[in-house]
Each structure stands twice: as C-alpha cells, then as structure tokens.
C-alpha cells in the first residue's frame, strides 16, 4: 500500500541496486529481466532502477516511456512498456523478435513477458503474442484471435502462455513440457544430458 519495492535473494550477478530516494513511495509495478529490472511509477513513467548507468535498459529508455504508461513487462534481456493509447514500446536486447510488434486487432490493455516473447490481451477480448517462437509460444490459438473467446487476463511462463476467458476457462499455448522435465532455469533436461551435461535426478 505504500508503493515500495522490496528485493531479496542473490544479487551477485544482477543489478538490483535501487535509489530509494528517487522511487520509494512511487512504485506501481516492476518487471524483471535476467539481471536487472524496470519500475512503473505512479506518474505513468518508466524508470530503470538499477545502479548500472551504462545498461541498455537505462540509456535506451524511449522518450514515449516517460509518461502515459499503464503496463510493463520484461523478457530475459528486454523490457516493454504499454501506453494508455495502446502503443507498445520495447528496448534492450531484442534480437529474438521482441521488438517486432505486430498489428493488433484492437488496443492492448495488458502485456506480459516470457523468456523471449511478449503476449498482450486486447480491448476486444483477443490475445496477441510476438517474439521468439521455438516452442510455438507465439502461436495464439485461433479462438483467441477471431472474437470467439473473450480473454480477460493473461499470464506467461518462460515458453508458454495462459489466458483466462470471461467464463473462467483457461487457454494455453507454447511449450507443453519436455521428456524428462526442466531444470530450475527452464532448460530441457534430456537435451542437457544428451549433450554431456550432468545433474542429479531422483527417480
């Protein structure tokens, strides 16, 4: 309720320093990449809240992200801001298609980020995904793009998406799982073992 952001965990390889005097009491939301994060402030602006001033997330913040932002999201190496007019801005490392924003059927009202992709719920109840598609995580089911289903909310995992419709039904697309499951970073255990990786498993 006091608009503060609290962080904990191992910060050895992450930039999670924060200028408390600048942002405390004004944080509405936060979006985390693999090693850093941005915050949405109560004035509708986006700020890079780490302490590495040379980070692309800090130096490449678009001018349009300084006001009117209503939703933020992040992938492993990029971040996105959704403005109140439906404009989506992305910056950071977008080499996997994260910056290839599609033509929407209506104004986006919420955005979520996976490992290398983004998904948005639109004002007309449809959904849209873009970015990396190795596991078909941007192949939105037809019923979520042709006005057949009224999507009310979305959530993303590393390589999958979950949409909740007006009737409370969940729709999913993307990675359906690996033969031997995943490790704690979402990687294919079977592929790791085949390629000489080692790990302990309980069967």
What are these regions (language model features)?
Residues 25-34, 68-76, 107-115, 150-153, ...:
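Repeated scaffold domains used in trafficking and secretory/extracellular systems
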Residues 1-2, 42-43, 84-85, 124, ...:
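Acidic/polar residues in short coil/turn loops that connect beta-strands
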Residues 7, 36-39, 48, 78-81, ...:
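Conserved core positions of repeat-based scaffolds
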């Amino acid at each position: 309720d006091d608009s503060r952001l609290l962080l904990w965990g191992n910060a050895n390889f992450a930039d999670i320093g924060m200028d408390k005097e600048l942002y405390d009491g004004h944080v509405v939301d936060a979006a985390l990449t693999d090693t850093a994060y941005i915050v949405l402030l109560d004035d509708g602006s986006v700020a890079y809240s780490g302490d590495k001033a040379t980070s692309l997330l800090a130096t490449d913040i678009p001018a349009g992200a300084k006001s009117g932002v209503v939703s933020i999201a992040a992938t492993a190496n990029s971040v996105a801001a959704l403005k109140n007019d439906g404009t989506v801005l992305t910056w950071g490392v977008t080499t996997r298609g994260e910056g290839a924003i599609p033509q929407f059927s209506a104004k986006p009202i919420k955005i979520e980020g996976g490992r290398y992709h983004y998904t948005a719920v639109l004002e007309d109840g449809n959904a849209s995904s873009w970015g990396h598609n190795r596991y078909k995580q941007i192949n939105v089911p037809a019923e979520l793009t042709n006005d057949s289903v009224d999507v009310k909310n979305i959530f993303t995992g590393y390589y999958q998406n979950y949409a909740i419709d007006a009737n409370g039904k969940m729709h999913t697309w993307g990675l359906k799982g690996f033969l031997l499951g995943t490790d704690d970073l979402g990687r294919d255990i079977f592929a790791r073992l085949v390629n000489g990786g080692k790990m302990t498993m309980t069967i």
